[in-house]
A protein has these predicted regions:
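ATP-binding Walker
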Residues: 14
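Walker A/P-loop
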Residues: 17
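Post-Walker A helix-loop "phosphate-sensing" segment adjacent to the P-loop in P-loop NTPases
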Residues: 25-32
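ATP-dependent small-molecule kinase phosphotransfer cores
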Residues: 34-94, 100
Length: 173
């Protein structure tokens, strides 16, 4: 059975990468953080001189200090076709982890780039991200995963959801 293409979204540091790691490690999905993908593709080259980064890893590690700048760089990358990055991500991986722009979301949704959208919520512990680096909202997702408990709770919640989304292909690897 073919795995559905999953778009995993949510506010910064709410657990998107952790959800994707669970999907990779236990359910055979592939993913790369969109921030890492973009850092490797173009952001490091665009910012290395401005911030004096020695290498791509240093640029990627510093991304939280420049959220709005990264957001705008990714928006610019997706002109004129707002679904460009999404198509590139899904050509290489089963999951696109970390989309933040509603224009790109709508472009991908309207062209069938992804199958399902999962919002990761940790709002009981962390604030929402600023609007200058995040324009998506929970209502845009097909499903919401609660990440307000323990890591074990999160793994259980991911398992329940993936068994519902793809019940015939969820044997743990």
């Amino acid at each position: 059975m073919i795995k559905p293409k999953l778009l995993v979204i949510g506010h910064g540091r709410h657990g998107k990468d952790t959800v994707c790691e669970i999907l990779r490690d236990h359910y055979g999905y592939t993913f790369e953080s969109s921030s890492k993908f973009c850092s490797l593709q173009f952001i490091y080259n665009d910012l290395k001189e401005k911030y004096g980064y020695a290498n791509e890893e240093e640029c990627y590690a510093d991304r939280h200090n420049h959220r709005a700048e990264w957001y705008n760089a990714i928006c610019d990358y997706n002109v004129p076709d707002a679904a460009t990055l999404g198509r590139e991500m899904f050509a290489a991986y089963d999951i696109y982890c970390g989309l933040r722009n509603k224009r790109e979301y709508y472009a991908m949704k309207n062209t069938g780039v992804f199958d399902k959208v999962i919002w990761v919520d940790r709002s009981d512990h962390l604030p929402p991200e600023s609007n200058d680096s995040m324009s998506l909202e929970p209502w845009m997702a097909d499903y919401i995963i609660d990440n307000n408990g323990t890591l074990g709770d999160l793994a259980f919640n991911v398992g329940q959801l993936i068994n519902y989304i793809n019940p015939y292909d969820t044997a743990q690897c």
